Regions:
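Short, well-ordered beta-strand segments in beta-rich or mixed alpha/beta enzyme
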Residues: 2-9, 37-68
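Residue-level signal for secondary-structure boundary sites
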Residues: 14-16, 60-62, 98
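Glycine-rich beta-strand-turn "strand-cap" elements at beta-sheet edges
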Residues: 37-51, 73-104
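Short amphipathic alpha-helices in soluble, non-transmembrane regions
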Residues: 20-23, 65-71
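Glycine/serine-rich loop-strand microenvironments at binding/catalytic pocket rims
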Residues: 1, 6-10, 86, 93-94
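Short amphipathic alpha-helical segments
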Residues: 14-37, 78
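A generic structural signal for ordered secondary structure
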Residues: 3, 23-29, 50, 84-85
Length: 104
């Protein structure tokens, strides 16, 4: 299992566009219907600090995610927006427990 988390702060004027890019990624991921990856994105109270959680069952799921055109477009747009704080990745996480089965 591959678990990654990223946190960054966008400029206030880019926050709505960032959310739209995220919605597109989510729509495309749902359309794939894959059961071997889960992706959640949160925004903090300031409306411009984003936290992404990605859990992939294996390297293949991660590769599919990374190669998704909408995800690549999201990343390019985020970089071009010159965020106040660029994405910072936490060290790779190890699952200790969950209230539900992640990949059944």
């Amino acid at each position: 299992m591959i678990i990654t988390t990223n946190r960054y702060v966008v400029r206030a004027e880019y926050a709505a566009q960032n959310q739209e890019h995220i919605r597109q990624v989510m729509q495309d991921l749902r359309a794939l219907g894959r059961t071997d990856l889960t992706y959640s994105v949160f925004v903090e109270e300031d409306g411009k600090t984003f936290v992404h959680w990605r859990i992939c069952a294996n390297g293949e799921a991660r590769k599919v995610f990374d190669q998704l055109p909408s995800f690549q477009a999201f990343q390019a747009a985020l970089t071009a927006s010159r965020p106040e704080v660029p994405p910072i990745s936490a060290p790779r996480l190890t699952l200790v427990g969950s209230t539900s089965d992640l990949f059944s």
